[in-house]
């Protein structure tokens, strides 16, 4: 018997999905998806980026949760395997965050890392 549980290379939390749902509703464009990507830069060599995108490009991976989608390009995904996209609210403010087991060091800002 096969399991219905599919292990995804990147997790997308309920908190993040709920926030995306609210933001997409505010924009009044149901085709928007949260795209997470990695660029060179930041104090540790790489940094995470988040944007809303209404396009899915060839090779992109999508994760659907609660009626919204997270999109990751293949180049970024290789650095994010095993990670988790979450949304947090605290004294420092509210933001999407990535927990990345591949990051050897991270910066105090939380958005920069090295591998």
Curated annotation (Swiss-Prot):
What domain of life does the UniProt record list for this protein's source?
Bacteria
Question: InterPro entries, per this entry?
Answer: FeS_biogenesis, FeS_cluster_insertion, FeS_cluster_insertion_CS, FeS_cluster_insertion_RrpA, HesB-like_dom_sf
What UniProt keywords apply to this chain's record, in alphabetical order?
Iron, Iron-sulfur, Metal-binding
Q: Name one GO biological process term.
A: iron-sulfur cluster assembly
Which GO molecular function, any one, fits this protein according to its record? 2 iron, 2 sulfur cluster binding
Q: Please give the Pfam families that the UniProt record associates with this protein.
A: Fe-S_biosyn (PF01521)
Give the similarity note.
Belongs to the HesB/IscA family.
Any idea what this protein is called? Iron-sulfur cluster insertion protein ErpA
Which organism is this protein's natural source? Photorhabdus laumondii subsp. laumondii (strain DSM 15139 / CIP 105565 / TT01)
